[in-house]
């Protein structure tokens, strides 16, 4: 492939960082920002944090977030956050030729670097994408004893559950746990009397037959709407109490409805 002239470069591409370009009209996302920051590091850095998480396939990462990279550069370009943390060779993997923190190390970094709610939601998404177990993440954190923020990180990791399928499901789970309820089982399968699967409840306390579901989007498809109604009716006939939560529901409302459900089963 031939070299581009300066005119071709300026007319067809836009600079992301110095000497790093993308085609005009390209929509930024976490993966693109990660690749650009790695090139900006002259291919020497190790992508970390949300950048590593995106490369490992995690969802729900804001396209406007900066890129995160472990690099010795103390004057990063705009849109790049550099960390100077020590890292062992076995905590680095290659993705598309780029050096990236492993999923386990990424989870520990997220727990150390970000506020609890942000970190739990991010690690839930990463763990789900990379098929990590919360117990294994906790074990990985033990090798970092003495690191700044590790005690807080361990408390954060204790709240992780890969069963949460979205940040709002994480929010809902944390809300009820912090209010004193035992951690619910996530993505709990519910079967009818014939052994056929009715559906998976986002969160459930099966011994009480109480379930919580977060409705992230309204079903406009009539067929899907009818299926949802039939599923809810079947669960109700089997003795389940299903609490459906939407973005319009405040914390007090959710907890009030849950208390009533528990009182009925006490």
Question: Locations of the language-model features?
Answer:
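Short gly/ser-rich loop at a beta-strand->alpha-helix junction or flexible surface loop bordering the NTP-binding
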Residues: 1-151, 167, 266
């Amino acid at each position: 492939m031939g070299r581009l002239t300066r005119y071709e470069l300026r007319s067809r591409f836009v600079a992301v960082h110095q000497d790093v370009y993308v085609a005009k009209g390209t929509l930024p996302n976490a993966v693109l920002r990660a690749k650009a920051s790695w090139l900006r590091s002259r291919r020497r850095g190790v992508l970390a944090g949300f950048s590593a998480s995106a490369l490992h396939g995690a969802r729900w990462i804001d396209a406007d977030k900066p890129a995160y990279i472990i690099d010795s550069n103390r004057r990063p370009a705009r849109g790049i956050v550099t960390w100077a943390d020590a890292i062992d060779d076995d905590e680095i993997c290659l993705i598309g030729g780029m050096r990236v923190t492993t999923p386990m190390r990424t989870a520990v970094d997220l727990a150390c670097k970000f506020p609890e709610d942000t970190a739990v939601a991010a690690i839930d998404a990463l763990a789900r994408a990379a098929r990590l177990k919360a117990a294994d993440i906790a074990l990985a954190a033990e090798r970092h004893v003495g690191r700044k923020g590790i005690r807080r990180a361990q408390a954060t990791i204790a709240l992780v559950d890969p069963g949460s399928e979205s940040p709002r499901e994480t929010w809902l789970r944390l809300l009820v746990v912090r209010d004193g309820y035992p951690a619910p089982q996530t993505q709990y399968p519910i079967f009818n009397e014939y052994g056929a699967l009715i559906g998976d409840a986002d969160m459930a306390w099966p011994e009480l037959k109480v379930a919580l579901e977060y409705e992230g989007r309204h079903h406009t498809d009539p067929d899907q709407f009818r299926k949802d109604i039939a599923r809810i009716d079947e669960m109700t006939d089997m003795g389940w109490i299903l609490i459906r939560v939407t973005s319009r529901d405040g914390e007090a409302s959710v907890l009030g409805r849950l208390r009533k459900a528990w009182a009925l089963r006490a």
